[in-house]
């Protein structure tokens, strides 16, 4: 019997690397997808390639998008500064419709691969407040996926799996370490340099550092 397949969104960060390890532990044959979408730096794409190689995924695909042509986010528009202090409401690092776009392309690849499970590393506990990281979004996208695809209407339902949804960052770190994830390969910083070193000041850096500290595990992050 063929091993079950899964498509996994892999950003190169801590969360998505953990999800790959979780899927592999569940017996999935893993296909990872990253996006060159006009983000501020290429460090996370380099990290995604390292993680995919280190974890031995079946195939790692990088899709080119031009979300910086739309702008509207500090991650895609160089005229908007990345904040270095917590903010109220949805932060300027939110990229309009990003997870909707990413999941749509992952859905297309999953249908081609005859995979029925798509994993995403969104989290609604220790997170930045993005609307497309909430459980309601994941559930709604799954319903849409099964209405919008040939496989879905033929009864071969897709599942959108978000195993980190209700975990704290410390719990995520502990789970990943238990599964052998090498977090030194990952990059979480919104404004990392070309060598993958982190600023230590942005929201993503803060959440990552707090997660390792709360987990009681040494943080392998390099800073500039």
From Swiss-Prot:
It holds the Pfam family QueC. Keywords: ATP-binding, Ligase, Metal-binding, Nucleotide-binding, Queuosine biosynthesis, Zinc. Zn(2+) binds at residues 189, 199, 202, 205. ATP binds at residues 10-20. Its EC number is 6.3.4.20. One of its GO terms (molecular function) is ligase activity, forming carbon-nitrogen bonds. It comes from the Bacteria. InterPro entries: QueC, Rossmann-like_a/b/a_fold. Coiled coil: none annotated. Binds 1 zinc ion per subunit. Pathway: Purine metabolism; 7-cyano-7-deazaguanine biosynthesis. GO terms for biological process: queuosine biosynthetic process. It catalyses: 7-carboxy-7-deazaguanine + NH4(+) + ATP = 7-cyano-7-deazaguanine + ADP + phosphate + H2O + H(+). Its cofactor is Zn(2+). It is an enzyme of class 6 (ligase). Catalyzes the ATP-dependent conversion of 7-carboxy-7-deazaguanine (CDG) to 7-cyano-7-deazaguanine (preQ(0)). Belongs to the QueC family. HAMAP family: QueC. This is 7-cyano-7-deazaguanine synthase. It comes from Pseudomonas fluorescens (strain SBW25). The lineage of its organism: Bacteria, Pseudomonadati, Pseudomonadota, Gammaproteobacteria, Pseudomonadales.
